[in-house]
């Protein structure tokens, strides 16, 4: 199964009054100065493939100069199918559509997944744990509707339980029902996270070794529930996590009431990168950290293809300027030639003549 993004059109969106972009099945390079709207087009592609944006905009922020309605349309083609994805934003509200029929964000996910790589991602290793959890969950939500449901349900449970904990009249007896709900959702989410991270970890290890020969990198999951049991049966693991989370919630109840926040569960877990057995967050050089992130993105591409049976749409937003020549070349080699890719740049000098010959280059604004 192979799907491609064929045609993107926007109206009253961000910096554009109107714009249409025909995409190559291989590489499309959007070249132009800063503020030409290149990143806005990357965001539009991400919105209609993942149902979300790395900018987390309000509906009003999508509308060009406040004059709506904002409309974004993306045509997907492949295997004899044509699918039209859409998004509209007006009066502070936004809605998605699929073949003209209104749908939720989930309705545009999973058809053609997308993998975004932008400069903000380069700090993923050294930033807080929430950044790495979000990277894993955002990717998982594209691959599985069940994953998306679990992440959403668990997030609501945490928010509502935290609201209860902040009340001055909250006591242990009131937490029982909430503890059961959050433990059920949390244990199921944990199992899904571990399965996805296990898929990603092997590709991260391989890709890192190919870029930085002689060094070994790994990525592991550290749970607030303690050491995870080495079991292959997912139901057995979920049962263990449920019981352990109930016990941990009870153990920390007094402190949680005092602090007004839930202290254990997947929302507090850590995803740890290591290089040569040492914490990458603490000891890795900037170059090593960037190679880890590069390897993570290569892994996302590989896992998306494995799980969904179609190569994802790769979105590279001005990231080439942040990588040195060796890492730029290594990244593009690891991705391969059969991945539909959209790249933004202010400088075509970052690319080889061979890539420029194969790519469709779209000039936006002044020639660069």
Predicted feature descriptions by range:
Residues 317-319:
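Walker B catalytic acidic pair
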Residues 123-124, 130-176, 180, 188:
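Long, charged N-terminal accessory/stalk domains
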Residues 46-131, 135-147, 201-206, 241, ...:
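Nucleotide-state sensing region of NTPase/ATPase domains
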Residues 115, 342, 360-362:
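Hydrophobic/aromatic beta-strand patches that form the interior of the parallel beta-sheet core
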Residues 38:
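Conserved lysine of the Walker
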Residues 100, 365-367:
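Glycine-centered positions in the ABC transporter ATPase nucleotide-binding domain
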Residues 1-33, 47, 174-184, 188-313, ...:
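Conserved NTPase motor "head" modules and their coupling/switch loops across ABC/AAA+ ATPases, GTPases
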């Amino acid at each position: 199964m192979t799907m491609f993004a064929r045609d993107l059109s926007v109206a009253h969106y961000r910096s554009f009054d109107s714009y249409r972009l025909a995409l190559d099945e291989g590489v499309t390079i959007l070249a132009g100065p800063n503020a030409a709207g290149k990143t806005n087009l990357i965001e539009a592609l991400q919105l209609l493939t993942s149902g979300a944006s790395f900018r987390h905009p309000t509906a009003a922020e999508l509308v060009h100069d406040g004059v709506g309605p904002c409309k974004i349309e993306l045509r997907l083609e492949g295997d004899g199918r044509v699918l039209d994805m859409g998004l509209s934003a007006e009066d502070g509200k936004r809605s998605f559509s699929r073949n003209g029929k209104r749908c939720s964000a989930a309705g545009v996910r999973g058809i053609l997944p997308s993998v975004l790589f932008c400069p903000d991602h380069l700090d993923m290793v050294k930033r807080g744990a929430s950044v790495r959890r979000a990277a894993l969950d955002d990717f998982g939500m594209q691959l599985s509707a069940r994953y998306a449901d679990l992440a959403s349900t668990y997030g609501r449970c945490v928010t509502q339980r935290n609201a209860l904990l902040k009340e001055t009249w909250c006591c242990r007896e009131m937490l029982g029902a909430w503890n059961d709900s959050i433990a059920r959702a949390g244990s199921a989410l944990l199992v899904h996270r571990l399965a996805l991270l296990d898929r990603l970890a092997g590709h991260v290890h391989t890709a890192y070794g190919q870029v930085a020969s002689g060094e070994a990198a790994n990525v592991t999951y550290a749970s607030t529930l303690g050491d995870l049991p080495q079991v292959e049966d997912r139901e057995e693991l979920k049962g263990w996590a449920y019981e352990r989370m109930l016990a941990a919630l009870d153990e920390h109840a007094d402190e949680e009431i005092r602090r007004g926040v839930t202290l254990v569960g997947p929302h507090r877990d850590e995803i740890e990168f290591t290089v040569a057995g040492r914490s990458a967050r603490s000891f890795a050089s900037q170059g090593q950290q960037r190679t880890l992130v590069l390897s993570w993105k290569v892994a996302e591409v590989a896992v998306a293809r494995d799980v969904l049976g179609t190569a994802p749409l790769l979105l590279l937003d001005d990231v080439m300027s942040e990588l040195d020549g060796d890492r730029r070349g290594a990244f593009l080699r690891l991705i391969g030639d059969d991945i539909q890719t959209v790249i933004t740049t202010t400088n075509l000098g970052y690319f080889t003549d061979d890539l420029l010959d194969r790519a469709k280059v779209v000039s936006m604004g002044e020639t660069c």
